[in-house]
UniProtKB/Swiss-Prot annotation:
Pfam families xrefs: HLH (PF00010)
GO MF annotation: an example: sequence-specific double-stranded DNA binding
InterPro entries linked: bHLH_dom, HLH_DNA-bd_sf, USF
Protein name, entry field: Upstream stimulatory factor 1
One Gene Ontology cellular component: Golgi apparatus
Ranges for domain bHLH: 199-254
GO term, biological process aspect, one: response to UV
Length: 310
């Protein structure tokens, strides 16, 4: 959006020129410019030209060339505005605190605002940012030769500063070259993120499918192991919960059987010990019987063993 220049007659008789409705590339909202004045801007000391931003932000400006001739269709007394070449570098000097409290223009801003004055590099001495050489001023007219805005520059240079967005084009003049953005805006692409999410979702679904298949296989194996489930027909539609319930009952029965068998095994061990003791006693008695028979033969006695079964 290009700035609109306005002239207003104040009570003291001085003419105050303001630029308003300026939008930068970063801030789309319009800002008012009103608080900068150059000591050598106008030939007339009563005319004050100031710039100021309402929110105290940075103001972008462009350098264009002003020719002294007239174009076809222009009114008399109006200068022609042409685009300044983009390839030609224009170094500008920035002077801070160009005003004093005596000659400053009253604005709505606070007293703590920082004021800047822009001078071309050709008009600034080496190493000094606040002094200008005495030279003629190149001016551009917008309403007529009466409202001339100038900047202390050598003759023929014809540059001045326009507070506007780089993408906007001045109306009423020839086309000018606009420098492209140094960092073009590129919207973030959501395609990689969508592809990554779909791939992650597919992997998750594959893992879940494998887990369900394993669980189903284990349940089928349980149904084959449990006697009650194996006897039932597959057409009955035995549920997984029913198979698991019968598996739990079968496991409980197996545990009880194992406990009962362990108790019986302990009883068998005890009987085995008792049997060993009795066997040892029988062997001892047999040995004593043989000794007694031997003694009886030694004394001439015949031992007759009678069978009770006869």
């Amino acid at each position: 959006m290009k700035g609109q220049q306005k002239t207003a007659e104040t009570e003291e008789g001085t003419v105050q020129i303001q630029e308003g409705a300026v939008a930068t590339g970063e801030d789309p909202t319009s800002v008012a410019i009103a608080s900068i004045q150059s000591a050598a801007t106008f030939p007339d000391p009563n005319v004050k030209y100031v710039f100021r931003t309402e929110n105290g932000g940075q103001v972008m400006y462009r350098v264009i060339q002003v020719s002294e001739g007239q174009l076809d269709g222009q009114t008399e007394g109006t200068g022609a505005i042409s685009g300044y070449p983009a390839t030609q570098s224009m170094t500008q000097a920035v002077i801070q605190g160009a005003f004093t409290s005596d000659d400053a223009v009253d604005t709505e801003g606070t007293a703590a605002e920082t004021h800047y004055t822009y001078f071309p590099s050709t008009a600034v001495g080496d190493g000094a940012g606040g002094t200008t050489s005495g030279s003629t001023a190149a001016v551009v007219t917008t309403q007529g030769s009466e409202a001339l805005l100038g900047q202390a520059t050598p003759p023929g240079t014809g540059q001045f500063f326009v507070m506007m967005s780089p993408q906007e084009v001045l109306q009423g003049g020839s086309q000018r070259s606009i420098a492209p953005r140094t960092h073009p805006y590129s919207p973030k692409s959501e395609a990689p993120r969508t592809t990554r999410d779909e791939k992650r979702r597919a992997q998750h679904n594959e893992v879940e499918r494998r887990r369900r298949d394993k669980i189903n296989n284990w349940i089928v194996q349980l149904s084959k192991i449990i006697p009650d489930c194996s006897m039932e027909s597959t057409k009955s539609g035995q549920s997984k919960g029913g198979i698991l319930s019968k598996a739990c009952d079968y496991i409980q029965e197996l545990r009880q059987s194992n406990h009962r068998l362990s108790e019986e095994l302990q009883g068998l061990d005890q009987l085995q010990l008792d049997n060993d003791v009795l066997r040892q006693q029988v062997e001892d008695l047999k040995n004593k019987n043989l000794l007694l028979r031997a003694q009886l033969r030694h004394h001439g006695l015949e031992v007759v063993i009678k069978n009770d079964s006869n």
